[in-house]
């Protein structure tokens, strides 16, 4: 253990005492969860605390021991009782008849009821300091502690090593194995952030164009503030003095802001001077560069866009730019310090990429709602497939989805207003004047809108994000015409113009020229109106991160009009949509979709084509309720009453089907079991069963916590069965899913058995036991099944017995006879370290094998020591194989190693080559999808089984 001077220990004691004295009275109701000393001898792992991006990256080896991690955050979780009390408070704060209506909390008041105790906070701070870390900040809301330290200190305290990794040409720092914490902290720590420097990407699309921004000759139009005022009916508010005066909008950033560009934008737009305030937390992120974790040019454009347009829609509002090395660090501090009543964050990612930190951030967003803060976020720019998009390793736009339907967080949080995107669609009507007027506007009136969808092979996936959350249940206020009966949080809530092509937003932003070795500032923009100083081009942006700060500006006008904080805006938005004012407040978008082209056989895309959601009457999963009329929104905001259900304790639901594979028309029985998430008790209420999102039968009352339903009306195909528990006066809602296969009663078909199961590897480097899969032909189906394997695990080596591997396609072939069965046993090998003598660092060896695109595969089950220069070169040869190389049989690798003397201790270590370490397979639980496809005449038949790989 590191020794400390008496001065250090004295300072620590004073810090702990200060925290205690400051909060003693208000924290009296919070119990201690840490009993006794925090010992490192007994530890528990924190699952889902490895970045999926790190798992896809090339490992360059351990980072230097003194590598500094400037902002690590240990997040705490509430007890079930605290969560129930907070849920109740949030409901009461939105009910006009409640004594808690709009009684917003301070951070200290939040901590007093929902944070950890001062004793526990001080104990954790003390333990961190003993490990050598420096405390950055202790959450005012009792939700987290931030600290800084080195890679060596992280390894000592959390049992995980920080590595240097490379992804898409960028170098990053990341942990590649799950961190662990002392058992004494297990009940209160939910996640650790800051062990990697993968930064969230902005949701903007930038194009620089040279035509005039309004041209009767070219027909090109771009949005200036004056156009926005006309299209979304902001002008009547501004003319009556509702312009944002007295309201602060906090904009989240992760790059230095150029204040001169903000000033020139306001001049070009005819807006009064209004200099933003900058608040920095932690290390200054600086300007764009190619250094690890540094800002990008996209961050610059995002910062300028958000500040300029939030301040354009609410021209007299105070704009606070909250800056740090990561936008979610900025968000954390904006909430914990209660910096502003309205928060705009234009950064996000698909839900599954957050791992366990999604729960920590959602709890933080609950704190924001309790404090009366309104948070708005983009719904994403990859259509209904948010886990796809961006660019591939070659820098080309990704235009085909492979990861299935997904939504963006934080927009998917029930405590955030998610903003989608539309395209202005004039048709044959002339909605534009030939010359610009006030605030550079030329739009004549509201312009009809369709779903934003610019997806193409050139643009890549480029459409309004939206869909169904896999992380959050449907909040009680999310109801109304068009809202799906999916029992999940649906996204988005509203939408505004977002297409950069028709018609994009004008901004002023530094024009950066990028090259292979450097990024050079080519000069400021907007030197001649909105034109850049160099080529005279216009900087035009789009994406849902353009609609987001604009909607934040509208909400600032609403807040000034109502004279009160809004808190979570969604309950009122949905109340307005369900009242008599829908057509006054919203512009319903009924044309278009956010569907994404998808690869046949990939997740959620068994037959190819596209997946996504279309627009419709009322609410839809592409644009929410549509765009808004700002004037009517502000004037009618207080005209509705929000009614909510009471808060309950968390519940858990499980569902099973019997049989899991049957013939169409046969009876299948669904059984749901509901229990408290913790403690004892017997939930009452009902369970609604659904098949592929459609209700089957009426809700079934629980009997001793169990509901049973039988049906013979399930259609043929792979189906998802959902059981949704309604909740009761004590327990909240919950849901669960199960997979079944129903084969045709008359047409050629086949089934897979089992449809679920678990493969377990005792440790990284071990193989799973063979898991037999049986394929059964019906109605004369015969031919060859094509098998594929997909998983999110970073290093794995699947193989099938009785099936022939096709190296060119990364698939397996399995013959099946008419009305017969075929069996193939799946084995998954995992990767562990192979030590190379002659190197000062233990190294890990991974050989690309049966690689699916973008996934590294390891040579599982190898053990031993490679010694001598020749053996090291052989290992280097294997590591150098391209990651996307077709399959190399493991026998070739074994043969080469044997020829060079693969054994423990053979050869000598003189001149041994150092290998780039490889992380091997991460521990944890990972989904594995096995898909089987066969053609029957002109029909392609596909079935899948959903398995789980557990690496212990």
Enumerate the language-model features and the residues they cover.
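Bacterial N-terminal signal peptides
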Residues: 10-19, 893-901
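Solvent-exposed beta-strand/loop surfaces, strongest in extracytoplasmic domains of secreted
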Residues: 644-896, 900-952
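An often Trp-containing, charged/polar helix-loop segment at the C-terminal end
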Residues: 427, 481, 559-621
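Polar, glycine-rich mid-to-C-terminal structural blocks
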Residues: 414, 418-462
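Boundary/junction segments of secreted and surface-exposed precursor proteins
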Residues: 22-56, 644-649, 745-757
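Acidic glycine-/aspartate-rich tracts in secreted/extracellular proteins
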Residues: 79-80, 151-152, 255-258, 423-426, ...
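A recurrent domain-boundary module in secreted/ectodomain proteins
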Residues: 619-648
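Substrate-binding/charge-relay-adjacent region of secreted/lumenal peptidase catalytic domains
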Residues: 29-140, 146-147, 151-421, 456-543, ...
């Amino acid at each position: 253990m590191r020794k400390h001077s008496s001065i250090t220990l004295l300072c620590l004691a004073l810090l702990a005492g200060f925290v205690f004295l400051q909060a003693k009275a208000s924290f009296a109701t919070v119990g201690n969860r840490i009993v006794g000393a925090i010992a490192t001898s007994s530890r528990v792992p924190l699952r889902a605390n490895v970045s999926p991006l790190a798992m896809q990256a090339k490992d360059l080896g351990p980072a230097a021991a003194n590598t500094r991690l400037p902002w690590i955050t240990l997040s705490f979780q509430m007890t079930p009782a605290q969560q129930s009390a907070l849920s109740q408070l949030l409901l009461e704060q939105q009910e006009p008849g409640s004594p808690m209506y709009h009684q917003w909390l301070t951070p200290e008041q939040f901590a007093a009821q929902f944070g950890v105790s001062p004793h526990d906070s001080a104990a954790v701070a003390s333990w961190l300091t003993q490990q050598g870390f420096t405390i950055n900040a202790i959450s005012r809301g009792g939700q987290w502690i931030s600290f800084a330290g080195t890679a060596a200190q992280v390894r000592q305290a959390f049992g995980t090593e920080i590595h240097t990794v490379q992804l898409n040409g960028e170098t990053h720092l990341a942990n590649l194995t799950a961190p662990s914490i002392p058992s004494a902290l297990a009940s209160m720590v939910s996640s650790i952030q800051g062990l990697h420097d993968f930064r969230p990407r902005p949701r903007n699309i930038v194009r620089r164009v040279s035509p005039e921004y309004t041209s009767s000759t070219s027909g090109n139009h771009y949005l200036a503030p004056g156009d926005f005022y006309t299209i979304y009916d902001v002008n009547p508010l501004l003319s009556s003095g509702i312009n944002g005066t007295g309201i602060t909008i906090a904009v989240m950033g992760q790059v230095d802001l150029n204040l001169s560009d903000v000033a020139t934008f306001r001049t070009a737009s005819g807006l009064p001077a209004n200099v933003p305030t900058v608040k920095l937390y932690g290390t200054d992120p600086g300007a764009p560069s190619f250094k690890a974790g540094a800002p990008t040019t996209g961050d610059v454009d995002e910062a300028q866009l958000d500040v300029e347009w939030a301040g354009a829609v609410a021209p007299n509002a105070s704009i606070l730019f909250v800056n740090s090395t990561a936008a979610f660090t900025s968000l954390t501090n904006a909430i914990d310090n209660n910096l502003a009543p309205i928060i705009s964050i234009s950064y996000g990612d698909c839900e599954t990429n957050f791992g366990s930190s999604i729960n920590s951030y959602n709890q933080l967003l609950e704190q924001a709602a309790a404090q009366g803060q309104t948070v708005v976020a983009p719904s994403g720019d990859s259509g209904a497939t948010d886990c796809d998009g961006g660019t591939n390793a070659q820098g080309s736009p990704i235009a085909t989805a492979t990861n299935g339907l997904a939504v963006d967080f934080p927009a998917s949080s029930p405590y955030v207003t998610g903003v989608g995107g539309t395209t202005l669609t004039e048709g044959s009507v002339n909605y534009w004047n030939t010359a610009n007027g006030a605030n550079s506007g030329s739009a004549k009136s509201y312009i009809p809108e369709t779903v934003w969808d610019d997806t193409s092979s050139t643009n890549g996936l480029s459409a309004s994000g939206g869909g169904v959350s896999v992380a959050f249940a449907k909040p009680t206020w999310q109801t109304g015409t068009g809202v799906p009966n999916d029992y999940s949080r649906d996204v988005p809530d509203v939408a505004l113009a977002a297409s950069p092509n028709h018609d994009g937003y004008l901004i002023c932003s530094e024009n950066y020229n990028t090259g292979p070795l450097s990024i050079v500032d080519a000069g400021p923009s907007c030197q001649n109106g909105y034109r850049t100083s160099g080529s005279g081009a216009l900087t035009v942006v789009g994406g849902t991160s353009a609609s987001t700060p604009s909607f934040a500006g509208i909400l600032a006008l609403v807040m000034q009009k109502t004279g009160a904080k809004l808190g979570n805006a969604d309950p009122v938005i949905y109340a307005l949509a369900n009242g008599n004012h829908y057509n006054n407040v919203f512009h319903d978008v009924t044309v278009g979709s956010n569907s994404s082209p998808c690869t046949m056989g990939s997740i959620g895309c068994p037959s190819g084509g596209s997946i996504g959601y279309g627009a419709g009457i009322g609410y839809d999963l592409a644009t929410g309720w549509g765009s808004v009329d700002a004037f009517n929104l502000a004037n009618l905001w207080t005209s509705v009453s929000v009614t909510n259900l009471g808060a309950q304790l968390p519940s858990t639901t499980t569902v099973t089907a019997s049989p899991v594979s049957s013939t169409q028309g046969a009876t299948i029985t669904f059984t749901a079991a509901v229990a408290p998430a913790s403690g004892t008790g017997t939930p009452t209420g009902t369970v609604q069963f659904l098949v592929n999102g459609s209700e089957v039968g009426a809700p079934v009352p629980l009997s001793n916590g169990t509901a049973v339903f039988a049906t013979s009306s399930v259609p043929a195909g792979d189906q998802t069965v959902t059981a949704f528990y309604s909740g009761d006066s004590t327990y909240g809602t919950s849901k669960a899913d199960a997979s079944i296969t129903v084969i045709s009663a008359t047409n050629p078909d086949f089934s897979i058995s089992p449809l679920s199961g678990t493969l377990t590897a005792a440790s990284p480097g071990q193989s799973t036991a063979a898991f037999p899969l049986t394929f059964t032909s019906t109605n004369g189906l015969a031919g060859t099944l094509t098998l594929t394997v997909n998983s999110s695990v970073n290093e794995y080596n699947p193989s099938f017995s009785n099936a022939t591997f096709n190296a060119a396609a990364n698939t397996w072939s399995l013959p099946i006879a008419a009305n017969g069965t075929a069996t193939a046993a799946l084995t998954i090998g995992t990767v562990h370290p192979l030590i190379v003598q002659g190197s000062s660092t233990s190294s890990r060896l991974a050989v690309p094998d049966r690689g699916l695109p973008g996934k590294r595969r390891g040579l599982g089950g190898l053990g031993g020591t490679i010694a001598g220069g020749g053996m090291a070169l052989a290992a280097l040869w294997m590591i150098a194989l391209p990651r996307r190389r077709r399959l190399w049989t493991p026998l070739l690798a074994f043969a080469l190693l044997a020829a060079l003397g693969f054994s423990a201790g053979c050869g000598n270590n003189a001149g041994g080559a150092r290998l780039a370490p490889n992380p091997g397979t991460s521990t944890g639980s990972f989904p594995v999808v096995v898909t089987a496809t066969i053609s029957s005449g002109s029909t392609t038949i596909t079935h899948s089984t959903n398995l789980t790989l557990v690496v212990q």
